[in-house]
Structure formats: C-alpha cells, structure tokens
Amino acid sequence: MEELLIENSHRFTIFPIQHPECWNWYKKLESLTWTAQEVDMCKDIDDWEAMPKSQREFYKQILAFFVVADEIVIENLLTNFMREIKVKEVLYFYTMQAAQECVHSEAYSIQVKTLIPDEKEQQRIFSGIEKHPIIKKMAQWVRQWMDPTKNSLGERLVGFAAVEGILFQNHFVAIQFLKEQNIMPGLVSYNEFISRDEGVHCSFACFLISNYVYNIPEERIIHKILKEAVELVDEFINYAFDKARGRVPGFSKEMLFQYIRYFTDNLCFMMQCKSIYKVGNPFPQMTKFFLNEVEKTNFFELRPTQYQNCVKDDAFAFKLFLNDDDF
C-alpha cells in the first residue's frame, strides 16, 4: 500500500507538520498566487491584428489545446488525486494546484475572447476537443494514464508529470518567442506566470515519484509513457505548422522536435532514470525561461496599476469591489 494513500485516523489538522518537504512545496506554490485579471492585454489586440495570418493560425491551435488541457488536469485533480491521497501536506498542494489550474483556464478563455472577436471562431477554439482530432487524441491519452482502475499511483504520477511538462512545454516555448519580437506583452506575461506554475506542478510530481512512491514504475514503463507524450507533441506540432502553412517566425518545427526531446531527458533525470534522446538544447538563449526561473519581482512589475480588461463581453468583465456600497 502506498504511503500517500494510507488514512491517518488520528490526524485532523495540518499542524504539527509531519511532511516538511511536501509542506515547503505547498508554500512555494502558495507564494505564486495570482489572478487572471491581473494581466493587461489591450496592446495585444493591435499586435494580433498586425501578425501574419499564418502565424495567427499557429497560435490559435495552441490556445485551442490549452483551453482543453487545463480542464482535464482539473478533472484529474478533483476526481482522482484529491479523493485518494491522504497525506495532508500533499493534499494541500493539490488543492492549491487545482485553484491555480482554474486561474489558468480562465486566463486562456480571456485570451481567446480578447484576441478573437468572432463568436463562431471562439466556439471552434473552446470546442477544441471536438474540432481538432489531435487535441481529442491527446485528451484521450491523458485520461487513459490518469485512470486509477488501470494504472498504479506511480504510473499516474509519471503520466501527470508528462502532461504538465511534455505536453505543455513546446507551447510555452512558442509563445515565449513572441517576447523576442517585442509583441503580445499580455499573452507573454500570462505565459510566463502559467509556465512557472506548471514547472512547480511538474517538479512536485517528480519529487513524489522519487521520495514517496513505494511501487515506482519500471524504467521501461516510465520511458514508454514519456515517449508516447513526445509522439503526441510531434503530431500536434505538425498539425499546427500545417495550419500555419509551415511559416512561424523564430523557430522551425524541427527545433521544437529537438527541444521537447531535450526537455524529456531532463524529466528522466528528475525521475532518476536514464535519458532517452541525448540531444542538446536548440534554444540556449532562452535557458532561464525553460528552467522556469521567471523572476518573482517581474510578476509584480508586470501587474497593471489598475485592473484592466479588453474583453467586450459582460460575462468576462471584471469588477473590483472597493467598498460595501458596491454590493
């Protein structure tokens, strides 16, 4: 029986802390708290309209993936991990992660509503799991490895790390290249905050695998899960580049193929496994971002002095209540 799944009938409160390392992970995640309305996307609208159509198509595919992916992550946390795991410090982490994933999901919805005014096109993106075969395939793969009736806790944690790491990482990289072009500051800011959060989520899964999981999956199983994730990313990249007619400034799909393999080898190291691909980093100029080392001070520098929202939709409008008279 896994320690993480054993009920302690004598423990009702979080204090005294019994698992200090897990508690430190929770406090780290707590320190990164932000809200979806704290990013100003007003300048992004003009940048988006000035962007070549092929480039916009590429980033639309990424947004279509993200609006689906975070919902599936939330689903796994609420229906599986948060019901099964009994170690309070770990449960606190996953409770905080679920809240963060809700912020991420809202943020991606705001991005779609801000950049894409046409409601039919918005709906096509929000329905990505139905409209894009590769996104549906990725969602099915995630649910397959998150199924507690078919996979051990260790296998599911490996799959979860692959989702938070491998499936998301190339999309983070692609958006971050917009910063080098000095465009889309709001989208880039969202990307930095979300990728930083996801980096902690992924690292925590690896920490649990290495330090708490008793029945650690065999290396061949870990490699199988990670390689399947890489193959899905390859398929998505090909699909997105086809939509963009092969033209995306800043990088080629071959560079993204190489990067995701470089990242996967680092994930292997974090899980104390042998590397699979043994390739170098094709984007050395962005190493700091790839290591999820966005400076925390930048988070506060990027916050607007007033909450702003460029979405022309009452359902997405944000109101800051200043006093009781506003209620």
Curated annotation (Swiss-Prot):
Sequence positions that bind Fe cation 2: 101, 164, 198, 201
Induction / repression: Expressed in the early phase of the viral replicative cycle.
Alphabetized UniProt keyword annotations: Deoxyribonucleotide synthesis, Early protein, Iron, Metal-binding, Oxidoreductase
InterPro entries (UniProt xref): Ferritin-like_SF, RNR-like, RNR_small, RNR_small_AS, RNR_small_fam
GO BP terms: deoxyribonucleotide biosynthetic process
EC number of the protein: 1.17.4.1
Broad EC category: oxidoreductase
GO molecular function term, any single one: ribonucleoside-diphosphate reductase activity, thioredoxin disulfide as acceptor
Domain of life of the native organism: Viruses
Co-factor binding comment: Binds 2 iron ions per subunit.
Catalysis performed (reactions): a 2'-deoxyribonucleoside 5'-diphosphate + [thioredoxin]-disulfide + H2O = a ribonucleoside 5'-diphosphate + [thioredoxin]-dithiol
Binding site for Fe cation 1: 70, 101, 104
Cofactors required: Fe cation
Enzyme active site: 108
Similarity comment: Belongs to the ribonucleoside diphosphate reductase small chain family.
Quaternary structure, from the entry: Heterotetramer composed of a homodimer of the large subunit (R1) and a homodimer of the small subunit (R2). Larger multisubunit protein complex are also active, composed of (R1)n(R2)n.
Protein function: Ribonucleoside-diphosphate reductase holoenzyme provides the precursors necessary for viral DNA synthesis. Allows virus growth in non-dividing cells. Catalyzes the biosynthesis of deoxyribonucleotides from the corresponding ribonucleotides.
Protein name: Ribonucleoside-diphosphate reductase small chain
Organism in which the protein naturally occurs: African swine fever virus (isolate Tick/South Africa/Pretoriuskop Pr4/1996)
